[in-house]
Curated annotation (Swiss-Prot):
GO terms for cellular component: extracellular region; fungal-type cell wall. Induction: Highly expressed during conidiophore development. It is found in: Secreted; Secreted, Cell wall. This is Class I hydrophobin B. One of its GO terms (molecular function) is structural constituent of cell wall. Keywords: Cell wall, Disulfide bond, Secreted, Signal. Disulfide bonds join 52-130, 60-124, 61-101, 131-149. Belongs to the fungal hydrophobin family. It comes from Penicillium expansum.
Length: 156
């Protein structure tokens, strides 16, 4: 009798862990691919750099991860128990860090007036961020602290 009860409990636990989680898309990008924190269409690179300040560099980032902003809804008695133990839960990729960033700089206008390359949304279609002037990686330094980037749309 005890063997049967324990076999049933293990089978239910395995079944609930095997069910796929319903993932809520509350991360940086929405399902249609637009950034979570958009910037106004008329914002120029100079205005955006002024918002970032002199201690940060205006950057265009391909990847962003926000831990705690995603929610996995698991159904079942022990749903999600094993996934949280192996590190596959909400925010498993990191905490509010941007990755694969390239610096955006002001270009010299070729035509009189505001050139098309001066509009920020024409330069970067991904995530626009203000990144600290130090590298945002923790590898190879004594302190081991990574200084992340902040989404420009969140501080406007």
């Amino acid at each position: 009798m005890q063997f049967t009860l324990s076999a049933v409990v293990l089978a239910l636990a395995g079944f609930s862990a095997a069910l796929p989680a319903e993932s809520m898309n509350n991360g940086l990008q929405h399902q249609n691919g637009t950034p979570r924190f958009p910037v106004p269409d008329s914002l120029t690179i100079e205005q955006a750099q002024a918002k970032c300040g002199d201690q940060a560099q205006l950057s265009c980032c391909n990847k962003a991860t926000y831990a705690g902003d995603t929610t996995d809804i698991n159904s079942g008695i022990l749903g999600g128990t094993l996934s949280n133990l192996i590190g596959a839960g909400s925010g498993a990729s990191g905490l509010g860090l941007f990755d694969q960033c390239s610096k955006l700089g002001a270009q010299i206008p070729i035509v009189i007036g505001i050139p098309i390359q001066d509009i920020l949304n024409q330069q970067c279609k991904q995530n626009i961020a203000c990144c600290a002037n130090s590298p945002s990686t923790a590898s190879g330094n004594l302190v081991g602290a990574a200084l992340p980037c902040v989404a420009l749309g969140s501080i406007l």
